[in-house]
A protein has these predicted regions:
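Hydrophobic packing residues within well-ordered alpha-helices of enzyme cores
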Residues: 63-67, 135, 211, 268
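Short acidic/polar active-site loop segments enriched in Thr and Asp
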Residues: 49, 116, 145
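N-terminal glycine-rich phosphate-binding loop and ensuing alpha1 helix
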Residues: 3-68, 75-77, 82
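Conserved alpha/beta core of the MobA/IspD/sugar-nucleotide pyrophosphorylase nucleotidyltransferase superfamily
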Residues: 2-3, 171-172, 177-283
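Conserved core of the sugar-phosphate nucleotidyltransferase
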Residues: 128-205
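A short, conserved beta-strand element in the Rossmann-like catalytic core
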Residues: 16, 126-128
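Short phosphate-binding loop-to-helix
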Residues: 71-117
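Short beta-strand-to-loop acidic/aromatic patch adjacent to the donor-nucleotide binding site
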Residues: 116-126
Length: 283
């Protein structure tokens, strides 16, 4: 298989309210690199050939002038807009709604670019190079239905405050379900080697058909049209339960870094300095 047979979809339309800024273009590296710069570098090194960045229209110009110029040197980069008026024909949402419609909708908005096996990640999560390697390996396997990179809870905790995590039930290497757990830290009683989802997925192109079906069912059924969202893990869970999707859990020993809180940024900058010193990234 060639590099262009696998696509990286990056969800970058979220607002990042707790962090208090636009994390998608926040600099963390010594030369102004963002988290996404490192994710794209790791993906390109692993073998990915294309990136699809899902953004809101208001963010597009700033993003392309900063991060976009850099990552376009590494991958074939395309853009998709996640807006509340980008919907299946005949559907609409109230004009009073400001927040995006959720991560499942984000992937649906990029469907025209997803004609290859594809990975899905968050733009503001630092996943580590090894995770992209195992994900690329799975996506180039001809018998794969879908996959998820499973992190160890202890490798995803914040030193600043508690976090919410999708705790996974895994049986025979396959994902059975995900339960959202709130307020987790090292003393919350959940074993630190518990497998959790950090929204790092892999799918075949036909998964967008399932997204389309679920989005059409979700839109008229919203109880709160201002806040309700269709989440990607929820779509995956439904597909697992009805037997239409089998999700292989890929093990990673990588440490995940995020910036849930503003104070987490210093920890991430120190980690990047350390990885540069170890030769994982260029200074």
């Amino acid at each position: 298989m060639t590099k262009k047979t696998v696509t990286l979809l990056v969800m970058a339309a979220g607002m990042g309210s707790r962090f208090g800024g636009l994390k998608q273009i926040e600099p963390f590296g010594p030369n102004g690199e963002t988290i996404l710069d490192y994710s794209v570098y790791d993906a390109a090194s692993a073998g990915f050939g294309r990136a699809v960045i899902v953004l809101r229209r208001s963010m597009l110009a700033d993003f392309r002038e900063t991060v976009g110029r850099r990552i376009e040197k590494l991958l074939d980069v395309r853009y998709a807009l996640q807006e509340n008026d980008v919907l299946p024909a005949g559907f609409s949402v109230t004009s009073e709604r400001a927040r995006p419609l959720g991560t499942a909708h984000a992937v649906w908005c990029a469907r025209e670019h997803l004609d290859t096996p594809f990975a899905v990640i968050n733009s503001d999560d630092f996943y580590g190079g090894g995770s992209f390697g195992v994900l690329y390996g799975a996506l180039t396997s001809p018998d794969l239905s879908a996959c998820m990179v499973g992190y160890r809870l202890g490798n995803t905790l914040s030193e600043t405050g508690t976090v919410n995590r999708g705790v996974c039930t895994v049986k025979n290497g396959l994902l059975v379900g995900i339960e959202e757990r709130f307020g987790l830290d090292r003393n919350s009683g959940v074993p630190l080697d518990t497998v959790v989802s950090m929204n790092m997925w892999g799918f075949r192109p036909d998964f967008t058909d399932r997204l389309d079906r679920d989005l059409r069912a979700f839109l008229p059924a919203m109880k709160d049209p201002i806040k309700d969202e269709l989440y990607l893990p929820g779509v995956v869970d439904g597909a697992i339960r009805d037997g239409s999707l089998s999700v292989k859990v890929l093990d990673t020993s990588e440490k995940w870094y995020g910036v849930t809180y503003r104070e987490d940024a210093a920890s991430l900058r120190e980690a990047i300095k350390r990885m540069i010193a170890e030769g994982k990234y260029r200074a």
